[in-house]
Amino acid sequence: MQFKSKHTKLFCLLIILAIGACLLYFWPITHLSAFAWKLRSQKIIVYLLVAIATGISTISFQTLTENRFLTPSILGIESFYVLLQTLLLVFESKFLQLEKSPILEFLVLLLLQSLFFLALQGYLKTLMKQDLVFILLICLALGSLFRNISTFLQVLMDPNEYDKLQNSLFASFQHLNTSILAIGSLIILALTIFFFRKAVILDVLHLQRETAQILGLDVEKEQKELLWGIVLLTSTATALVGPMAFFGFMLANLTYLIVKDYRHKLLFVVAILVGFISLTLGQALIERVFALEIRISMIIESVGGLLFFILLYRRARR
């Protein structure tokens, strides 16, 4: 009873903080125009979607890899998504010259990325057996390679075309990709249901691979399905607001600090609430305190990067 009461108090506190962050974000409510209401409502929805996608995908990925320092973003999935998007847009503008369809492009990119990373699953499992420093070096090198190729292709483009492509290439919290908001919401909602149903499987995988196999779990099959879902969640979040290297890492590790529990349903809910509060409250402070002179992604990357090195230092000291 004390265990349940503790989590109930935690949920109530996080929900109150989330409501407070929303009220601060919409304040003053009576002075907002219809356009401002619509824009802020869309942003609130996107903040919730990003918190859901990032929190669930990162915690699930860390369970699969048995490593709390690795995230889909650090492995370069976001950078690879940007590279695919750049290649697709360059190919369309140079060869096909068709009218742009953001939804079709988004679906094609999701399909390509899913197929690519599922094909590399065998190599990924081999990589996870290596030393953490080696893994990080490989991942940083791959991420840098993907970003440099993307930049090189963009430099070769006509300046006018390049300017037109910026909105679709690099979304942000200030400039949301609302053209795919509806389909992105459906994908994230469907995958959220999928991961909550797989939460018990993740609880078993948390006991490590050998134990899961002894308990009769088809580890290979479950890992493939979960990895596919993680790639889709990460890609959808990247398409909505752009790449955020350390947001998932920050969410997951703050959740582990807040909740001393292995059950993934509980971890998912706390991570979603923490992510939503962080994004909403952070954006409200940036608009009111910093007068939009900085971006929320800068704060997220700074805090997340600092937390990453602190935890890495603490691990090295053990």
List the model feature ranges, each with a label.
Residues 1-318:
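Alpha-helical transmembrane segments in inner-membrane proteins
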